[in-house]
Swiss-Prot record:
Cell location: Cytoplasm
Family: Belongs to the RecX family.
Species of origin: Neisseria gonorrhoeae (strain ATCC 700825 / FA 1090)
Location (main, coarse): cytoplasm
GO CC terms of this entry: cytoplasm
InterPro entries named among the record's database cross-references: RecX_HTH_2nd, RecX_HTH_3rd, Regulatory_RecX, WH-like_DNA-bd_sf
Protein name: Regulatory protein RecX
């Protein structure tokens, strides 16, 4: 029979694999904690030693997802993980990067421009689902198949 891992060792294992927000780490450790106080002590220690950082988590999350998702979806996902809006707003990609990402996502999913209104609405819904705002969706639909537009960004 294996000996039980300490809460501190479990936290170290989790953080050695990937960046995790404080709320995410708390959720993963909670079933193994004997008390709320013990859990908070471990979380505070890891934050003080900078082993767990919400800022690093947000940077890594945005870096990995920003090519596929828009600012609205990224902001919402970070808020669910307990990252405050000010932090997430500072890390989000700028407007031109987001428009280029929307165009890339649109071109990958749909190989040709919309032939009719129904197809255009389908493409707009797809981009909106991915978290792109209305302005970005309209720009992407308008310029996705313009070869010269990317150079002007």
């Amino acid at each position: 029979m294996k000996p039980q891992k300490s809460l501190r060792a479990r936290a170290m294992d989790i953080l050695s694999r990937q960046e995790v927000s404080r709320i995410g780490l708390k959720r993963k450790l909670a079933p193994h904690a004997e008390s709320e106080e013990e859990l908070e002590n471990v979380l505070n220690e890891f934050a003080e030693r900078n082993w767990q950082s919400d800022l690093r988590y947000a940077e890594a999350y945005i870096r990995s997802k920003s090519r596929k998702h828009g600012s609205l979806r990224l902001k919402q996902a970070l808020a669910q993980q307990g990252i405050d809006e000010k932090t997430s707003r500072n890390l989000l990609p700028d407007r031109s990067s987001e428009k280029q990402a929307a165009i890339a996502v649109l071109r990958k999913k749909f190989k040709h421009p919309a032939a009719n209104l129904k197809e255009k609405q389908k493409q707009a819904r797809f981009l909106a689902y991915r978290g792109f705002d209305a302005d970005t969706v309209q720009t992407a639909l308008k310029h996705a198949w313009d070869e010269n537009w990317e150079d002007s960004c």
